[in-house]
Amino acid sequence: MGAMSPWHWAIVALVVIILFGSKKLPDAARGLGRSLRIFKSEVKEMQNDNSTPAPTAQQSAPAELPVADTTTAPVTPPAPVQPQHTEPKSA
């Protein structure tokens, strides 16, 4: 009872033809075919991109970088902050 018989498929096809018309169906099928073709080519391109790693530049030994001046001026600690005592105002 769950499977569709050929009569069910015929009725579905007839309803689709009536709803969309015989002129729009070939255009819709053509558009669907183009979309699937584009989708397949994009998937194939993504698979090719993932399987072949991108060519990397030659990794030669890094040239010696000039050493920056590492001496710094002595740091003086900040002056301690004394909390301000505020007395509650009497009303």
Swiss-Prot record:
Membrane topology: Single-pass membrane protein
Segments forming a coiled coil: none
Region of interest (Disordered), ranges: 44-91
Source organism superkingdom: Bacteria
GO CC term (a single one): TAT protein transport complex
Pfam family, one: TatA_B_E
Compartment list: Cell membrane
InterPro entries in the cross-refs: TatA/B/E, TatA/E
GO molecular function: protein transmembrane transporter activity
Listed transmembrane segments: 1-21
Region forming the signal peptide: none
This protein's UniProt keywords: Cell membrane, Membrane, Protein transport, Translocation, Transmembrane, Transmembrane helix, Transport
Biased composition (Low complexity): 51-74
Gene Ontology biological process: protein transport by the Tat complex
NCBIfam families listed in its UniProt record: PRK00575.1 (NF001854), tatAE (TIGR01411)
Record family assignment: Belongs to the TatA/E family.
Function, as annotated: Part of the twin-arginine translocation (Tat) system that transports large folded proteins containing a characteristic twin-arginine motif in their signal peptide across membranes. TatA could form the protein-conducting channel of the Tat system.
HAMAP family linked: TatA_E
Subunit structure: The Tat system comprises two distinct complexes: a TatABC complex, containing multiple copies of TatA, TatB and TatC subunits, and a separate TatA complex, containing only TatA subunits. Substrates initially bind to the TatABC complex, which probably triggers association of the separate TatA complex to form the active translocon.
Protein name stated in the entry: Sec-independent protein translocase protein TatA
Organism: Rhodococcus jostii (strain RHA1)
Upper taxonomic lineage: Bacteria, Bacillati, Actinomycetota, Actinomycetes, Mycobacteriales
